[in-house]
Amino acid sequence: MIGVIDYGLGNIRAFSNIYKSFDIPHRIITQKHELSGIEKIILPGVGAFDDAMKKFNTSGMRNTVEKMVFENKIPILGVCVGLQMLGNSSDEGVEEGLGWIDA
């Protein structure tokens, strides 16, 4: 099951529509308890880096997603701002990134 993280800034519907058209099992994740059973994670993002980091950090999902990725080895794919969030920081903002990629 693919989990698409919905932290308030993302093209969630686009992912959902694509997965539905190919009958790919997926779940839109809005709360950390919904991450149970997820085998792959999509971290989308649209908009400004700082806004995305603030929203993700206050979503309550960061620690759970981090544990899934690093301890349980669940693959994650960042798309658009979601990919930028995986790095240390962005030239387009002042917030710290997740620091999962040394960039």
Regions found by a protein language model. Give the residues of each.
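N-terminal beta1-alpha1 ligand-phosphate binding loop
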Residues: 2-24
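Cysteine-nucleophile active-site neighborhood
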Residues: 47-103
